[in-house]
């Protein structure tokens, strides 16, 4: 359905219907059990800093049960840990996770479109390089606050290509893992790719990131059908 071509009243009704559907699925016994089972197997807490653009739906794009990924949203994905409230919220999130004995993976995202630059992020005037540079600065801030050792809080920069909902992970020295260039047949090699991209990432964190990448490969394949 081309919702963008509908009258505004129909679009508002559609949005509320989506919210009701999301709420019902989130509160269902099946999804609660799926969350508990997932967290028992993958204890790393996953927080995502992202733009308020509704296309950036990480659980949907990675086939992750609802309620696993903790979002932190702002216009354009523009953040500064020097903002008092944001600093308090993020520090509180990390402290709660640490008290529960969990590591934290912070995924700092920007988004772009390969098909049309103007489907990218308006918050950065559709300048993907500027958006990525900003996420790198946020990563540096996270490391300044939570440490460079990465044993407890591990920040990564991740692009989100909105044409195919594909993840683009950035490592050090320009290394990348672009899931749009892989297929489902490459899923068994993801663990090795991650180990090469993030050699200092704790094994448990890598193991808990893997299902998101495998889910994203499956999601991309479905979009391409």
Regions found by a protein language model. Name each.
Residues 49, 106-110:
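Short, conserved beta-strand edge motifs with alternating hydrophobic and charged residues
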Residues 53-55, 112-115:
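Solvent-exposed loop/turn segments at secondary-structure junctions
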Residues 1-44, 76-89, 94-104, 113-225:
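Divalent-metal-activated hydrolytic enzyme cores
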Residues 50-78:
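Catalytic core of membrane glycerolipid acyltransferases/transacylases, capturing the structured
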Residues 44-45, 68:
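A generic secondary-structure signal marking the coil-to-beta-strand transition
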